[in-house]
Curated annotation (Swiss-Prot):
Organism lineage: Bacteria, Bacillati, Bacillota, Bacilli, Bacillales
Entries under Gene3D superfamilies matching the protein: BH2638-like (1.10.220.80)
Signal sequence coordinates: none
Positions of disulphide bridges: none
Family statement drawn from the similarity comment of this UniProt entry: Belongs to the UPF0223 family.
Organism field: Staphylococcus aureus (strain NCTC 8325 / PS 47)
Descriptive protein name: UPF0223 protein SAOUHSC_01044
Length: 91
């Protein structure tokens, strides 16, 4: 599916790619499953770019409106698994 990713035009190209990569991991979590370590690595990089909780919440809400995927719930679920575990959304 195609979504509009919440991108800040003040970010560098590398930062934009990293944020999109994180949201790709959120998509995989909901669609086919993702390794917890890979997901959390992408989230850690996302947090380097977006360290403020308020901004993170705003970006997550924008992505959820576009995709229907709740990034916050994905992060909270993946955090409860070991790095090598494959995690997918509960249906």
């Amino acid at each position: 599916m195609e979504y509009e990713y919440p991108i800040d035009l003040d970010w560098s190209n590398e930062e934009m790619i990293s944020v999109i990569n994180f949201f790709n991991h959120v998509e995989k979590y909901y669609e086919s499953g993702v390794t917890a370590g890979d997901f959390m690595g992408a989230y850690k990089r996302f947090k380097e770019i977006v360290p403020a909780k308020a901004e993170e919440k705003q970006i997550f809400n924008t992505f959820e409106k576009s995709s229907g995927y709740n990034s916050y719930k994905a992060v909270q679920d993946v955090k409860t698994h070991s790095e090598e575990q494959r995690v997918t959304a509960k249906k």
